[in-house]
Design a protein with these regions (language model features):
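Beta/alpha (TIM)-barrel catalytic core signal, keyed to glycine-rich beta->alpha loops juxtaposed to Asp/Glu
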Residues: 1-169, 174
C-alpha cells in the first residue's frame, strides 16, 4: 500500500523492489492507490509499471484529475477496481444499507435512469472503465461461476454513450465505503 512507501521505511522497500526487478525476479512493479493525489509523491519516488486504482461512475477522480491520461502517456498500465462501488451500484434501491441514505438522491436518480432506459446496472458500470482506452484492465470480484458469466455478458453489451455526471461524488464516505 502507498502508506508503506511514503513512510520512513519506504525508500528501503522501493530499493528492495528495484533489486528484485533488476534481477528479473519481478517483471513489473505496481502500486495500489485510494486517491490519485498519492501519485504526486509516488511517481517521484519510484519507477511504476502498474497503478491499481478505484474508478467507477461515482468515483471518477482518476480520470478528472488528469492522472489517467498522464499514466497512459508514460506507458504505465492502469488496472481499475471498485467498478461496482463495493457492490452498491448493483443493489436494488431498497437493499442499499441505511448508512448510505444521505446519498439517496444519487441512488434514486440511478435507479430511475436504469429503469427509464431499460439498462442493466452491471453493463452501465462496466461500460465506463471499459470505454476508456487508457485503462489496461478492469478488476472485478465474483462470488460464483454464474455471476462471472453474467458479468462477462454484461461487459459485452455495447451501450450508447450517456452522461452519468449526476452520479459523481467526492465524498470519501461514499466513494471509499
Amino acid at each position: 500500500q502507498t502508506k508503506n512507501l511514503l513512510n520512513k521505511k519506504g525508500e528501503a522497500i522501493i530499493n528492495a523492489l528495484n533489486k528484485l526487478k533488476s534481477r528479473g525476479l519481478v517483471k513489473k512493479l505496481g502500486v495500489s492507490i485510494y486517491n490519485p493525489t498519492e501519485l504526486d509523491h509516488l511517481v517521484k519516488m519510484m519507477e511504476i509499471d502498474i497503478v491499481q486504482a478505484p474508478l467507477n461512475i461515482i468515483d471518477t477522480r482518476l480520470e478528472t484529475s488528469g492522472w489517467l491520461s498522464k499514466l497512459h502517456k508514460n506507458g504505465i498500465e492502469v488496472h481499475t477496481r471498485s467498478t461496482f462501488l463495493q457492490g452498491l451500484l448493483l443493489m436494488p434501491r431498497i437493499k442499499i444499507p441505511s448508512k448510505f441514505n444521505r446519498w439517496s438522491k444519487i441512488w434514486d436518480c440511478w435507479t430511475q435512469e436504469l429503469k427509464k432506459n431499460n439498462l442493466n446496472a452491471a453493463s452501465v458500470c462496466l461500460s465506463y472503465p471499459l470505454s476508456l482506452p487508457e485503462v489496461s484492465r478492469v478488476i472485478i470480484g465474483v462470488d460464483n461461476l454464474n455471476q462471472f458469466k453474467s458479468l462477462i455478458s454484461a461487459s459485452n453489451i455495447n451501450l450508447e454513450k450517456k452522461d452519468w455526471s449526476f452520479m459523481k461524488s467526492l465524498d470519501l464516505k461514499l466513494i471509499n465505503p
